[in-house]
Amino acid sequence: MSSHKKSAKEYMGRIRHANNPPYPPKIRRALSCALVFLLSFSLAAGLLIYSDLSGRVNNLGASSLLGRTPPDSYDGRALNILIIGSDSRSGKGNQTLTNNDDPTERSDTTMIMHISKDRSQVNVVSIPRDLIVDIPSCQRSDGSSSEPQRAQFNWAYSIGSLGGDRASAVVCTWKTVEKLSGIRIDESIVVDFNGFSSMIDALGGINIYVPTKIKDQKNSGLELEPGCKHFDGKQALAYARVRHGVKGSDGSDIQRIQRQQAVMGIMMRAALKKNMFTSLNQLYGFVGNGLGALTVSEGLSSVSQLSGLGWSLQSLKPDNLLFLTLPVYEAPFDRNRLLLSEKKAEPIWDSFINDTPLPAGVEVRDGNGNVRTITEQTPASQTPQDSSAPSAAPSQTPETSESTTQESKPVQDMRQSGSLNSELSPEELAELQRKCEARN
């Protein structure tokens, strides 16, 4: 049991207001994807309305639990950011770390965002919540620590949250991701889903093409026929999160991840279409809703650093923002659990660690909503860097050893993952979505 004790208040900081906020410039080239979208919440606040809105960003304060000093600059190096979607359903949209009333809050969505050294490429990999992983011992802010265990991935967040605060939950997920991947995570962002919903409402809703029938009366109450739908924030959130009652779906997390990635892209394109980043009045309301939904690590709570990072990404091309999902297969001991296909995952991890292009054969969804397979090198920094990866490499246990028998039931067909369980091809679905978004 660790003797390291600190109160929650020591971990939960607020960004101080600037004495002289900068005059708001017009951002001429808006960021063009859901990932950078998360960063743009804080970026826009820092550049445009910092004196009022920056106090709404929650500072995680996790460095002392990780035993690290926050980085003082992002210049000249690649960056790996852990993004966690909070599964707290307590009804409070903007929980702070000091009043979190859900001690077993779970991570509903987890992604690693890799920003290349030259800022020309952003790759985002989603980690299924049902993936069985090795969860290391995690120190909590109340002085306790957990035992190492093998369990479902999103348990890491729950195990950490038993310390009574979000910092402990994030750190346990952070350490689990590093152990799984060998990637050194630099920063983290936790997104409260209630804030996600309110931001969609600030857009006036979004248009989504639903490719297949959904009837989930027992869980979400969602009932949808195929076709173009206009969703408010609550409806869009329910659609992004639904797992059961989706025609053609096995109820796994893979198809839900694909829907979430698609909805984030739709949300960002809607913001661009409505000129949210060039109209100060609209930006104020839009960003104001988003900032309260974010809890960030110390490096991202620095407005000067975050502004510089966000500004350096303003020329990012949508084609160079790529979403992908880890290659997994059905666990032989439980059809509702997943195991990592390590041989297929290793080249993906290596591309993040060395800041090199994604490997050929990986299917991705780009910032324009198009699904494609990597056939040649994508633009990125070509010079491998010393990313100071954790000393513990991903472990291979008997439970994760790959064999032809174990992988006979792949959960994710890399050539079909963009179809979202419909009879439509990824290309057909992308075209229908474009037409749907074009409607008023």
Q: In which residue ranges do the predicted regions lie?
A:
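Non-catalytic, solvent-exposed segments at the cell envelope interface
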Residues: 2-440
